Amino acid sequence: MTTPAGSGRGFGSVSWWGLSPALDLQAESPPVDPDSQADTVHSTPELDVLLLGSVDGRHLLRTLSRAKLWPRRRFNFFALENNLEAVARHMLIFSLALEDPEKMGLQERSETFLEVWGNALLRPPVAAFVRAQADLLAHLVPEPDRLEEQLPWLSLRALKFRERDALEAVFRFWAGGEKGPEAFPMSRLWDSRLRHYLGSRYDARHGVSDWDLRMKLHDRGAQVIHTQEFRRWRDTGVAFELRDSSAYHVPNRTLASGRLLSYRGERVAARGYWGDIATGPFVAFGIEADDESLLRTSNGQPVKTAGEITQHNVTELLREVAAWGRARASRGHPEEQQRSEASPEPGTPASTPESFTVHFLPLNSAETLHHKSCYNGRFQLLYVACGVVHLLSPELGACVAPGGNLIVELARYLVDMRQEQLQGFNTQVGERAQAAGFAPQTGARPSETFARFCKSQDSALGSTDPAVEPGTPSLDVLAQPLEASSPAPEGLTQPLQGGTPHWEPCQLPSESPGSLSEVLAQPQGALALSNCESHSNTGV
């Protein structure tokens, strides 16, 4: 059966990359008030940002790379994701970006970043790096003191103990806890997912790919994405081919995620790929550039592809972020550090490793954050990804300080949504933002990618959710809990221990995300492997 256009199933139920260009969060936040509170320890103003569903850390890295353009501030990034695999990818990507330049050169870091971040298959050297780094992180997560010593920019103190256990299990799987390609047969999982998504259109998948690219992505502003690179990603999951195609054959385990399913009346954790197979990772770094020459056209065709622009942007971003690695290496020489602080060199970023912290919040805590005084009215900026807009509520709005800003990612580059559905989605975003106590920013530049709001002074809890217009896709379509799975189509699952399993929806209590963490924290051998994704309301 062919998936109808506009179902949203190509987006998937787990996000691995954003569907919007990276933002400098300082440019989106309210201006610094000289008389405002300052961090008494660092004697610098603080910027507290809450990010829901940012998944890949692109906004954080962009903000850090451009810190030298702004007055000195201390950043507190609070990230809230709906699965621990996204938290693990955050940690891996940041540890790669902050890697000591003497251990890994800039080109190697940028190429490794692109492959780990956006490719379903890796080259063996990149896979070896992932295993080594995952093994290190698996040993650091259970030891908070050692973690704080080696990764001072990271804080996991807000996570529950069972979430930390599950996070350790994720890293151990990445490190090769289960040997052999059958532990995560990415190529087969990708093809099975694609077959079910396209249905009877599978044999014409190249035509479908070209239609989605030219009639949707190109029309919506992503003209630099080339037909060949988009078609290659749709077919194989390899977005950035920096070497010969034969070099990419190791499954990228960082794209694996777990889901609770019912098997013979018991709950089991199935591992598979439930991410995006429609848009791709080209939008985040590949359709905009500070260097306008990269966007130049010749005879109406872009001179550079999205992959080339992405590689350039990521390389420049990591070049700026490398300053944090140099500052970290100088911590053992106080006199050198004092000298550099007294007379900073031109071009040196205005931040150091100690001037920002990434805090990870417990899963599914968006509705309860306002109950804690440390979060109530704290954040100057709230960022909400399009896949978690259903979490935007008056309770969440109470966490934003008066005069704070709200940035909502729109579904502009979600190819499964038609134009009228995009307009309905934008209307729902505005209604939810208003109900949460926000008003449209006055003087904000028009954008089809982000909706910008500011906190109303008279906002209060108790507003009701806005009504959904007929024919408008529900915000919940873009992202649902991993447990909200329904039976998989026949023939798309791998039998367990002989015989054909019968997949049924797993009805779980309200604390099911915690239950999932408990199951994933079991020894890796206890995890059931699904050959492909089960059919759900959010992804196929």
Curated annotation (Swiss-Prot):
One of the GO biological process terms: motile cilium assembly
The name this protein goes by in its record: Dynein axonemal assembly factor 3
Top-level taxon in the UniProt lineage: Eukaryota
Disulfide bonds: none
Keyword set, alphabetical order: Cilium biogenesis/degradation, Cytoplasm
Subcellular location: Cytoplasm; Dynein axonemal particle
GO cellular component terms given for this protein: dynein axonemal particle
Major localization class: cytoplasm
Organism: Macaca fascicularis (Crab-eating macaque)
Region of interest (Disordered), residue spans: 328-355, 485-522
Function: Required for the assembly of axonemal inner and outer dynein arms. Involved in preassembly of dyneins into complexes before their transport into cilia.
Protein family membership: Belongs to the DNAAF3 family.
